[in-house]
Amino acid sequence: MSKTRIVESVKNLDLVTTRALLDAKPELLAVRNPQGRNLLHLACSASCERLRVPETDAVRMVTFLLDRGMDIEERGLSGRDPCPPIFFAVAFSRNPAVVKCLLDRGAKATAAPGGGLFAAGWWGDVENLDLLIRAGSPIDVVVGVTPFLASWCWKRFDAAKFLALKGANVNYRDKKGKTALHHGVEKEIDPALLTWLVAHGASPDIADNDDVSPRLKASRKRDKRFLAALA
């Protein structure tokens, strides 16, 4: 019963109950849920929006658990991947206050898969992208593709633009040799976005593995707005 109570109290960011349970049974600090996540992973995953509490409630819980001696880099499972607490803060709670707290306490952004950038990009969380990059996550880390190209293909354009402005390689080619512009023309993304990308360094003349450039691909479309966007 105590194990269930402490898991629920941490997930609900109930610091009063969590403190009381740990004071009574310090060994509960080692509890993990069925997915192999410890109390710190659960605290970092708690959605303040869902719980309708301030982001600072999560920071207080995380700080409390760290002060009790929990390892800031201990890994828990996200799917099949072992991930540190900062990943859960980026991918699950999406809480920049917790991300900043962890970084201030010494968490390594680079310990998260993809430096946390793919998770932040998937959600379009620009503030978390900024925190992670400032903390040392390599902007062009490759996990199949780069965070920029992934964000672009996911149509998370605020994230993709942010990464481009921070210096991401906008001409990165995937395994088929395709750049963001190739994908943009193929998917008929808003021509204004294609124009923006060209203005920020994307080349419409890079050929893919089939020797087709974005400009050539656009020239074959009936809708000539896509070709004009690459001028």
Place the predicted regions along the sequence by residue:
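Ankyrin-repeat-protein effector appendages
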Residues: M1-R5, A135, K166, L193-T195, ...
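Ankyrin-repeat boundary/"N-cap" motif
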Residues: S2-I6, V31-E49, R75-F88, T110-A119, ...
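N-terminal alpha-helical scaffold/docking segments in eukaryotic complex subunits
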Residues: V7-K11, L21-A24
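Ankyrin repeat A-helix N-terminal signature
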Residues: E8-L13, L42-A58, F88-N95, A119-D125, ...
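Ankyrin repeat domain, specifically the short helix-to-loop turn at the C-terminus of the second helix
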Residues: L22-E27, R60-D71, K100-K108, D130-P138, ...
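Alpha-solenoid repeat scaffolds
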Residues: L28, A46, R50, I72, ...
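A generic tandem-repeat structural signature
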Residues: A58-K108, G114-G116
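Eukaryotic tandem repeat interaction scaffolds
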Residues: G115-K175
